Amino acid sequence: ALNSADISFLCLPDAAAIEAVELVENEKTVILDTSTAHRTAPGWAYGFPELSAEFEAKIISSKRIAVPGCHASGFIALVYPLIEAGLLGKDALLSCTSLTGYSGGGKKMIAEYEGYEKGAPLFAPRQYGTSQQHKHLKEMKAVCGIDEFPIFCPIVDDYYSGMEVTVPIFARQLKSGGIEDIKAVYAEKYNGPVVTCGDESQGGFLSASALSGTDGMKICVYGNEERILLTAIYDNLGKGASGAALECMNLVLGKEKNYGLSIKR
């Protein structure tokens, strides 16, 4: 089936994804892999076209495309442009907190949260990945080109979908500029249609589910001239997963990036 398809989406565990790719002999078949297996592999395009014209061009021309990880998508969207613009050095020591809905854990976790025997711990936020070995760390470091892995704090909470990924920085960590320069870099980089800049807060609160059910991403900058919060809001099932895969497919097919996607205006 893979060899007879024009485009195939792999939604498999890493080992199975690697085996599936090895079965493809048709040089015209385009593979979009949603697993972790090929996100930093040579010869594979990384499926985040908004990062640069080069990223987009590679997706369009490639037969092998790795769909970004949900947590990694937010971190990379925030950090990559600042490294590229020279505002943040590659030697920056960074941390990242990523809040996600329980659908990101797959069928087993969804069943745990929605089952009749739901335990008390599942009604509160739960931090995981405490050993600092989360599988998204590799692509976070590699794609951004930073020297060190960030300290990464993923948290799953009692709601279905939506992500809020925050990277805090001190202004003195910047090689040049300040909070307004960061906003300017993002505004130039992310002007739609899928990734945009703005303020998703309401009454001083920022909801991780603000873009639940959509395929876009909103980049927000908060703080002051000393301490700055960089935040990406999106759906872990949208721009963090299937929405990103469909966006890459659109590019391969010569369509607009947002064709068939649900984008909040």
Enumerate the language-model features and the residues they cover.
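Short capping/connector residues at structural and topological boundaries
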Residues: L51-E56, R64, K107, Q133, ...
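Predominant activation on well-ordered alpha-helical scaffold segments within soluble catalytic domains
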Residues: I76-I83, L137-K141, K183, G243-N250
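Residue-level signal for short, function-critical loop segments
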Residues: C70, Q173, N236
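NAD(P)-dependent Rossmann-like dehydrogenase/reductase catalytic/cofactor-binding core
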Residues: G216-R265
